[in-house]
């Protein structure tokens, strides 16, 4: 009886342990699975941490042999990044589902504050900068005027070299001076003649035209005023001539004058020219 009772006492705790072990499984089946991943808010910050840790992974390759270093580093880097991506969540989302540029409310608030400050700064500069620009422009113009007043053109001095033999130059100057003096004396001698010629020319210009010159002018330009109905027979006059029977006479300067014809309008328009008859024939 005692042995039986002992087995019961020993077995009883075993049944209790088995029941206690089966209870967590039942509760786990009844409740949803717990998320053991690290909760993060910004994917960008996690990527920066991964990049920083990747440098340490690259430094570990210094102790590896060269033939397997590149492959081992690539495998270690891929394993590290895969492990981080699988064990990180962003607001309950996996690595692939989360956005890289996710912003929190605090970040948005900070950005809004910075944007407001920029707006205020720009508005202030719009009021102040035109005045400052105008002042700087005025100062610049004044400085330019002052610099222009101080500007003086540079004059380079000429090097005057003395002729080692000035006698030849002096002789040349003497010859030229004599030639110029001779020309001036000749000009002064010819000056009275030129003055006399000029006075005569001025007297000729002041003279009035003679009647004979007027008649010549009329004869020259008479063809411009000649009419078609003009009959020259009406104005022709007889001229005295010597008869043919007369013998040879001595040369004389006697000029036979024409008889004056009665005045007519045609004679006034077209006067006859005076003709001289040579009697030395």
UniProtKB/Swiss-Prot annotation:
Subcellular location: Nucleus; Chromosome, Centromere, Kinetochore
Keywords: Cell cycle, Cell division, Centromere, Chromosome, Chromosome partition, Kinetochore, Mitosis, Nucleus
Main location: nucleus
Keyword Cell cycle tagged: yes
Region (Disordered): 11-30
GO biological process, one term: cell division
Cleavable signal peptide: none
Low complexity biased stretches: 19-30
Record-linked Pfam families: Mis14 (PF08641)
GO annotation, cellular component aspect: kinetochore; MIS12/MIND type complex; nucleus; spindle pole
PANTHER family hit by this protein: KINETOCHORE-ASSOCIATED PROTEIN NSL1 HOMOLOG (PTHR31749:SF3)
Known role: Part of the MIS12 complex which is required for normal chromosome alignment and segregation and kinetochore formation during mitosis.
SUBUNIT field: Component of the MIS12 complex composed of MIS12, DSN1, NSL1/DC8 and PMF1. Interacts with KNL1.
Protein name: Kinetochore-associated protein NSL1 homolog
């Amino acid at each position: 009886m005692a042995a039986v009772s002992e087995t019961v006492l020993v077995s009883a705790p075993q049944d209790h342990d088995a029941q206690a072990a089966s209870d967590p499984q039942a509760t786990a089946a009844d409740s949803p699975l717990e998320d053991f991943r690290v909760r993060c808010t910004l994917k960008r910050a996690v990527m920066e941490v991964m990049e920083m840790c990747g440098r340490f992974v690259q430094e570990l390759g210094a102790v590896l042999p060269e033939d397997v270093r590149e492959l081992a580093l690539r495998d270690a880097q891929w394993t590290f990044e895969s492990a981080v991506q699988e064990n990180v969540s962003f607001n309950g989302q996996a690595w692939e589902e989360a956005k890289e540029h996710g912003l929190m409310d605090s970040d948005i608030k900070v950005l809004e504050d910075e944007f407001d400050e920029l707006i205020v700064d720009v508005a202030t500069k719009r009021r102040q900068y035109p005045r400052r620009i105008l002042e700087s422009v005025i100062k610049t113009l004044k400085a330019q005027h002052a610099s222009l007043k101080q500007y003086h053109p540079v004059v380079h001095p000429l090097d005057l070299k003395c002729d080692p033999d000035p006698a030849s130059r002096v002789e040349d100057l003497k010859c030229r001076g004599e030639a110029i003096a001779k020309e001036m004396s000749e000009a002064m001698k010819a000056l009275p003649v030129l003055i006399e010629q000029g006075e005569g020319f001025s007297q000729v210009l002041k003279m009035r035209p003679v009647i004979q010159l007027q008649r010549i002018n009329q004869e020259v330009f008479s063809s411009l005023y000649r009419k078609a109905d003009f009959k020259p027979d009406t104005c022709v006059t007889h001229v005295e001539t010597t008869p043919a029977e007369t013998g040879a006479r001595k040369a004389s300067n006697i000029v036979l004058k024409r008889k004056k014809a009665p005045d007519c309008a045609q004679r006034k328009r077209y006067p006859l020219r005076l003709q001289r008859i040579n009697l030395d024939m």
